[in-house]
A protein has these predicted regions:
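Post-transcriptional modification and biogenesis factors for structured RNAs
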Residues: 1-239
């Protein structure tokens, strides 16, 4: 189950266009975080056309913390980081679609929030840090930022393409957010026992492991195997 999330959208027309694009590609769940405009006004309805039902059923919440309800939170950004900036180390929409198709297939039990930032400033660094992984659309280095609805269209198109293929994984349970939190708590215990020449290296390790686990889209069985391995390491540390 995939939900399109818009953070503090400012333009009713953009929201309406997003709703129309969602219906074009068979996505129906729209979540608005602290919208800065009336998303049900005439401009929004006019742009939505036959997707007004998506606008009417849109869920509105106050802040980003609501996204903790989802198993995976996938953020989008036009601002790229270097190899050393783990938080802004992205994948492309086609790679995301490929991974989701191969790993999750038609599994509808795994909840995914696909998050698009503010029209003017995008997602904050803190919000990006709260995402499990980041997606970016390749564009000209001279001007990377796309219009909100255009960015949504590109990403959802890539997500839609694999849906026409046969899926074989609908019966396989995947790791939940709670499972990932348990894994990270164990990794934190292991990291706490290690000495690093530079203090920031420990936090970098934590972020790398968090991103690595999220990008892998582990099945529940794979996650349990990982947890068992981490428990053995902790047992060795404790003697």
């Amino acid at each position: 189950m995939l939900c399109v999330v818009l953070v503090e959208p400012e333009t009713p027309g953009n929201i309406g266009s997003v709703a129309r694009i969602m219906k074009n590609f068979c996505f129906r769940q729209l979540l608005l975080i602290n919208p800065k405009c009336n998303y049900l006004d005439g401009e929004a309805y006019g742009r939505a056309m036959h997707a007004r039902d998506i606008l009417k059923k849109a869920v509105v919440v106050k802040d980003f913390s609501y996204l903790k309800k989802f198993d995976y939170v996938i953020g989008t950004t036009a601002a790229l980081g270097s190899d050393y900036n783990v938080l802004r180390s992205p994948i492309t929409p086609d790679k995301l679609a490929q991974q989701l198709s191969q790993r999750l297939g038609s599994n509808r039990k795994t909840s995914i929030a696909l998050v698009f930032g503010r029209e003017g400033t995008g997602l904050t660094s803190k919000e990006i840090g709260n995402c499990d992984l980041i997606v970016t659309i390749p564009a000209s280095k001279k001007y990377r930022a796309l219009n909100l609805s255009h960015a949504v269209a590109i990403v959802l198109y890539e997500m839609f393409k694999p849906s026409k293929s046969v899926k074989l994984t609908s019966h396989i349970p995947f790791a939940s957010r709670h499972d990932k939190e348990i894994a990270m708590s164990m990794i934190n215990v292991i990291l706490a026992s290690m000495d690093f020449a530079i203090g920031s290296k420990k936090e970098t390790q934590r972020m790398v492991w968090s991103r690595l686990i999220s990008k892998s889209f582990l099945t529940r069985r794979e996650m349990y195997a990982l947890l068992g391995f981490l428990r053995k390491i902790i047992k060795m540390i404790n003697g």
